[in-house]
Regions:
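Second-shell loop/turn segments in exported
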Residues: 17-30, 63-74, 116-119, 154-156
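Alpha-helical hydrophobic/aromatic positions enriched in membrane-embedded helices and signal peptides
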Residues: 17, 36, 64, 89, ...
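Glycine-rich, aromatic-flanked loop segments that form ligand/cofactor-binding clefts
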Residues: 1-12, 29-56, 76-101
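Second-shell residues forming the walls of enzyme active-site clefts
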Residues: 75-189
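Short glycine/serine-rich loop/turn segments
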Residues: 11-15, 47-69, 94-116, 157
């Protein structure tokens, strides 16, 4: 077989979120999610850190880029919704990421702290909007935080360490009652 088949143990590789969005068919995101759920279940995996809910606010972002569905909030919501439904029906636990958003950063958080200088209104109405909608729809059993510093929300702590962000916004304002996980704590950020 091909080297891709060897690296993936024979599992099918699928397009990144931006590739799915480029098809213009959100139902394809659902079908891909169902297929991913089948593959993960066959390997004994029941929890996946996906989908990426980041808005591609900075197309030069080196770590998000094609991992984002779109630079348009409504498209991110629709494609992520279909992905979450596919995972849920396939009995795969989704952990949406990277709360409160990493699509506006300009560097890869694996190598250092990323600071996003959006104002609070922009963060709440654009970056966090997919979480707000999908939490309300009951599609997010788990959310992964990110190590981005948002001075408009918390001048001192990155999202992962911020009580203002995780408790104040995610739990209290958005009403999230599920499991919060974190991105790798050994990243450069």
């Amino acid at each position: 077989g091909s080297s891709a088949a060897i690296r993936t143990g024979g599992y099918q590789l699928f397009p990144k979120p931006m590739g799915l969005r480029a098809t213009g068919d959100s139902k394809l995101a659902y079908e891909v999610a169902r297929a991913i759920a089948r593959q993960m279940k066959s390997a004994g995996i029941n929890w996946l850190h996906s989908p990426v809910l980041d808005i591609n606010s900075n197309p030069d972002n080196p770590s998000i880029n094609t991992r984002a569905y779109s630079d348009r909030v409504e498209e991110v919501i629709e494609y992520a919704r279909q992905t979450c439904i596919g995972f849920k029906e396939g009995k795969l636990i989704a952990a949406a990421k990277h709360f409160p958003g990493d699509g506006g950063s300009g560097r890869d958080g694996h190598y250092g702290i990323t600071v996003v200088h959006f104002d609070k209104e922009t963060i709440l109405n654009r970056e966090i909007q997919p979480y707000r909608v999908l939490i309300k729809e009951g599609l997010l059993p788990s959310i992964m935080s990110c190590h981005v510093l948002y001075p408009a929300l918390d001048e001192e702590y990155v999202g992962t360490l911020s009580k203002r962000i995780l408790t104040g916004i995610l739990r209290e304002e958005l009403g999230f009652e599920g499991v919060i996980t974190t991105d790798s704590m050994t990243m450069g950020a």
